[in-house]
């Protein structure tokens, strides 16, 4: 699962 906050984080 990837979430977009500051940058792409797995």
From Swiss-Prot:
Keywords: Amidation, Hormone, Neuropeptide, Pyrrolidone carboxylic acid, Secreted. GO terms for cellular component: extracellular region. This is Hypertrehalosaemic hormone. It is found in: Secreted. GO terms for molecular function: hormone activity. The modification Pyrrolidone carboxylic acid is found at residue 1. It comes from Locusta migratoria (Migratory locust). Belongs to the AKH/HRTH/RPCH family. Its main location: secreted. The in vivo function of this peptide is unknown. Has no adipokinetic or hypertrehalosaemic activity in locusts. Has hypertrehalosaemic activity in the cockcroach P.americana. Disulfide bonds: none annotated. Synthesized in the neurosecretory cells of the brain, and transported to the storage lobe of the corpora cardiaca. GO terms for biological process: neuropeptide signaling pathway. The modification Proline amide is found at residue 10. It comes from the Eukaryota. Coiled coil: none annotated.
């Amino acid at each position: 699962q990837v979430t977009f906050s500051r940058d792409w984080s797995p």
